[in-house]
Amino acid sequence: GKTLGVVGESGCGKSTLGRVILHLLDSTDGQILFEGEDVTHVDKAKLRALREKMQIIFQDPYSSLNPRMSVSEIIMEPLQLKGGMSHAEMYEKTKKLMDTVGLAARLENAYPHELDGGRRQRIGIARALALNPRFIVCDEPVSALDVSIQAQVLNLMLDLQEERNLTYLFITHDLSVVKY
């Protein structure tokens, strides 16, 4: 698990780069290599398999979460889309993911508007981890958080990287976050 930092001014294309790598936006030229394979122009089936290995943590935890879904529903959604697990298995995995990112079990039926920014970002992190990815684009994951919460979330991300051997593309405009 390594981290590559992408630092630049607002509007310079950092987030666009992350989205192109994940195929959330189409590339216009060049190649994107993932695990030694060109994934620039893959069919839908291959793209679906890639998405399990490549995830994103968005900058704004509030706008990236569906306000009509509970915490457990948000975290469980990728598992439902993938299929192959019973509801009980998905629920168990969701509870484990909540524990992994430091979300109390009592929050499973809470909605995003009921939580602070740090907890919302932990939901986004748990959702990104649900399919056991190898690579995560971290698109300014702490820029919308209070400074005290930023350190907690960054420490969590470092711990997860070590435990799960994750590779991060860490996008930020703040050099102190990259140094952290």
Protein language model annotation of sequence segments:
Residues 22:
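Helix-to-loop junction immediately C-terminal to a conserved catalytic motif
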Residues 30-38:
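Conserved ABC transporter NBD signature motif
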Residues 38, 88-106:
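Conserved ABC ATPase "signature" region
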Residues 39-55, 81, 87:
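ABC ATPase NBD coupling module
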Residues 111-115, 119:
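Conserved ABC ATPase signature
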Residues 125, 153:
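Hydrophobic anchor residue at the start of the ABC signature
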Residues 130-134:
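A short, proline-enriched helix->beta-strand linker immediately N-terminal to the Walker B motif
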